[in-house]
Structures are given as C-alpha cells and as structure tokens.
C-alpha cells in the first residue's frame, strides 16, 4: 500500500526527546517552533525566547511568506524559502521536525510541514501532540537561542500540491477535484464571523464540503488514528481515492486536511493557497455561499 512508503509525517514526543538526549540535533535533524497567534493574544516569538524545545529554531511564518501579496500567508518564492530555511541550518538532507505551542496541540505546524513538501522536501514531520504535550510530559525546555550553522537548501516547487484561484474556479465547471473546507462550521456556513478579519465576510466556495480540522485532533491534542481519520472523511462522503483540494481562510488549517489524508495513505492533496480570503475578494458572487444575513457572501 502507498502509505507504507511515505515518509513518517508524525514523530512522538518520546522519539524527539530521545533524539535530543542522544545529540542528534544538528545538520541531519533540525527542530522548528512554528507558533503563530492572532494579534493581541499571545506573542509567539517572545514565548519561544522564554522556553522552547532544546535546539529548536523559530520559524516565523510572517517572514517566510509572500509579503507583496494582498492575501494572507501566501507562499514565498522558491528562492525566499530556500534562503530562509537554509539560514536555519536546514539542507535538502535534513530531517525537519515542526511543532507549535497552540492549546489545541497543533495549529500552524501542519502548514510548515506542507510548505516543506510543496518545495520538494520529503523528510519533514510534525511533532504529534505539539509543545502542549511536550510540556505536559515533562520533557526539557530551554531559553537558550539556537544558532545553527547556515546550510544550502534548494527549493523546487511541486505544483501538484498547490492550487491557484484560476484552477479552483475552473474546477467549479470540471469538478475534477473534491473541494474540502477545514474551517469551523459557523464560518463555513456564514453564520459566524471570520475572526480578526476586516472586510471579509464568512461563507464558503460553492460545492465545497466542510470537514473542520479540529475533528482530526483528540481532546489531548494528538492526531487521531488513520482509522479514525478515514471514518471522518467517509462520514462527509469525501473519497480519498479521488483528487482533492483543501481550502480554509488563508491556507493554514487546510494543511491539516493534507496531513490527515497523508496519514491515510493519500499524499497528493493540493492546498488552495489563497483560500477564502482570496476567493471572497476575487470570485463571482454566485460562487460564494453564505447563510449569513446578506445571503451570498
């Protein structure tokens, strides 16, 4: 089966703790804290500076993105990504482990996992349970900054894992791909607002199916088993044997869909990078669906 040859998308806290204890963090193994929080809530970089997994570097998703785009969190260029992660000591031969400090156990880490994959890097994993469970289990932390020796990372964009506005618009006619939206149900339906969004009504792309990403996580913040993940997709009539595009608001939690499908043996889920924040501003009104007070979004 295909999932038997896929690189492990998850590593356990126990595995990472043992790897750190045995001195494996270095050019062949790098750890990244990819935390990000809504403005006015928590300060990701400050929290990293106060405590983080020993040897971890801070991956600033605000810096490693296309800052010229009017849309949120769009992918950087190949050169930008390669330079950014190279400065974190990551080469094309490095195993990268990503975590974040979100209370859910995982929020932004799957986005960075997907970013590495979309830029051609196979050996990347998410820390299952995140920093939340690293702390809960009593593993070591440090405030000591990580200063890895810079490395060379050649990024090669894998366009099959990325979808553009034009491709999603065309898909409304061709229906070659299933379209799955990972946001909370109220935001998908248009009955709850998009948080911290100015000029962005909630709602969804016509024809998309709602599978909230939090369904993939246990109450303790771990990824559910492949069997449980398959059942979630099946319950929403999402066929993992067929092509699939993941979307959300800004291309972040959509990566949870890509990760969950990967754990079920499906590595080819594409993410619509602009997601709802782009669709709302560019798409024809009849392709935007909302149950909110204004009808169409």
Swiss-Prot record:
Chain positions found as Phosphoserine: 38
Rhodanese domain ranges (all copies): 25-143, 173-288
Alphabetical UniProt keywords: Acetylation, Glycoprotein, Mitochondrion, Phosphoprotein, Repeat, RNA-binding, Transferase
CDD domains: TST_Repeat_2, TST_Repeats
Keyword Protease part of the UniProt annotation: no
Matching InterPro entries: Rhodanese-like_dom, Rhodanese-like_dom_sf, Thiosulphate_STrfase_CS, TST/MPST-like
Residues holding substrate: 187, 250
GO cellular component, one term: mitochondrion
TM region(s), chain numbering: none
EC numbers for this chain: 2.8.1.1
N6-acetyllysine modified-residue sites: 14, 136, 163, 175, 224, 236-237
Tissue expression from the record: Expressed in numerous tissues.
Enzyme category, top tier: transferase
One protein family per Pfam: Rhodanese
GO-annotated molecular function: 3-mercaptopyruvate sulfurtransferase activity; 5S rRNA binding; sulfurtransferase activity; thiosulfate-cyanide sulfurtransferase activity
Glycosylation site residues: 35
Record PTM N6-succinyllysine, positions in chain: 14, 136, 175, 224, 237
GO terms, biological process: epithelial cell differentiation; iron-sulfur cluster assembly; rRNA import into mitochondrion; rRNA transport
Function: Together with MRPL18, acts as a mitochondrial import factor for the cytosolic 5S rRNA. Only the nascent unfolded cytoplasmic form is able to bind to the 5S rRNA. Involved in the formation of iron-sulfur complexes, cyanide detoxification or modification of sulfur-containing enzymes. Other thiol compounds, besides cyanide, can act as sulfur ion acceptors. Also has weak mercaptopyruvate sulfurtransferase (MST) activity.
Assembly and binders: Monomer.
Domain remark text: Contains two rhodanese domains with different primary structures but with near identical secondary structure conformations suggesting a common evolutionary origin. Only the C-terminal rhodanese domain contains the catalytic cysteine residue.
Name of this protein: Thiosulfate sulfurtransferase
């Amino acid at each position: 089966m295909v999932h038997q040859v896929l690189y492990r998308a998850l590593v356990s806290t126990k595995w990472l703790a043992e790897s750190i204890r045995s001195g494996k963090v270095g050019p062949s193994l790098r750890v990244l804290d990819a935390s990000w929080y809504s403005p006015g809530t928590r300060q990701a970089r400050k929290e990293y500076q106060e405590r983080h997994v020993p040897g971890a570097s801070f991956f600033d998703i605000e810096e490693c993105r296309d800052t010229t785009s009017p849309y949120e969190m769009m992918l950087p260029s190949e050169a930008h990504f390669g330079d950014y992660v190279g400065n974190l000591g990551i080469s094309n031969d490095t195993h990268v482990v990503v975590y974040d400090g979100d209370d859910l156990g995982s929020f932004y880490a799957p986005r960075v996992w997907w970013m590495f994959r979309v830029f051609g890097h196979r050996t990347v994993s998410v820390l299952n349970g995140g920093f939340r469970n690293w702390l809960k289990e009593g593993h070591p932390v440090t405030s000591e900054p990580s200063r890895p020796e810079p490395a060379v990372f050649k990024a090669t964009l894998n366009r099959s894992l990325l979808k553009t506005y034009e491709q999603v618009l065309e898909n409304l006619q061709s229906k070659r791909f299933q379209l799955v939206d990972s946001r909370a149900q109220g935001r998908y339906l248009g009955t709850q607002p998009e948080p911290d969004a100015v000029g962005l009504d909630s709602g969804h792309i016509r024809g998309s199916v709602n599978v909230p990403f939090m369904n993939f996580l246990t109450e303790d913040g771990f990824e559910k088993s492949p069997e449980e993940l398959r059942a979630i997709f099946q319950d929403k009539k999402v066929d993992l044997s067929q092509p699939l595009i993941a979307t959300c608001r800004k291309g972040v939690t959509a990566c949870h869909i890509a990760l969950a499908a990967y754990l079920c043996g499906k590595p080819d889920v594409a993410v619509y990078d602009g997601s709802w924040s782009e669709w709302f501003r560019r798409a024809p009104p009849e392709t935007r669906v909302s149950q909110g007070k204004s009808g169409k979004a």
